[in-house]
Amino acid sequence: GAGPAGMACAEELRKIGYQVTIYDRYDRPGGLLIYGIPNFKLEKFVVERRTNLLKESGIKFVQNFEVGKDKTLYELKENHDAILIATGVYKAREIDIPGHNLKNIFPAMEFLTASNRKGLGDKVKLFDDGTLDARGKDVIVIGGGDTAMDCVRTSVRQKANSVKCLYRRDRENMPGSAREVGNAIEEGVEFVWLSSPKRFV
């Protein structure tokens, strides 16, 4: 994985003289730093500059490579002395309530990845056709962590008609940073505290 953990490990190993190859399934190194965190929080040129420094140090990046499809873990082990698995967690937690499979309900990372790819100049079908573009829409984000804050603040920047954040606890008990919540409120996000959805309609 060429995300934060994989790149940090590769850098430390390279410093003490190891030859390091990073395999990653995506077309760019950076993982969550490139595709998950919005540009207004982390400009992508910073990640790209860091990646270039790692390449200059001798670290090899192999992109668009899927373990299990392009090569098995066993095949990789035959060609390397050690393997670090730093694949990250991209699987969304599902809300198991009636209607969770309805149209226009998306996991946070799908929305953020589409937005970040668009910002990088990629063609993104589900953004270009309006599916994952919040422009003119009434957006509801469920959750209170930093990823939820990234979603509401990205929706504001995409010119959503309205943006609400539903969270099951009160403001004092949100897991996200207080600064992020404050920024979202300043940007016009409406928070609905002590709210937990029972069904989607």
Language-model region placement:
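Active-site-proximal loop->helix
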Residues: 30-37, 177-183
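Glycine-rich FAD pyrophosphate-binding loop
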Residues: 16-34, 163-172
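Hydrophobic or amphipathic alpha-helical targeting/insertion segments
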Residues: 13, 20-23, 79-86
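Cofactor-binding loop segments of dinucleotide-utilizing enzymes, especially the Rossmann-like FAD-
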Residues: 2, 25, 144, 167-170, ...
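Residues that mark the start of a beta-strand
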Residues: 19, 137-138
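Conserved Rossmann-like nucleotide-cofactor binding loop
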Residues: 5, 28, 90, 147, ...
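A Rossmann-like FAD-binding core segment of flavoenzymes
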Residues: 45-94, 100, 110, 116-129, ...
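N-terminal Rossmann-like FAD-binding beta1-loop-alpha1 element of flavoenzymes
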Residues: 1-21, 147-156
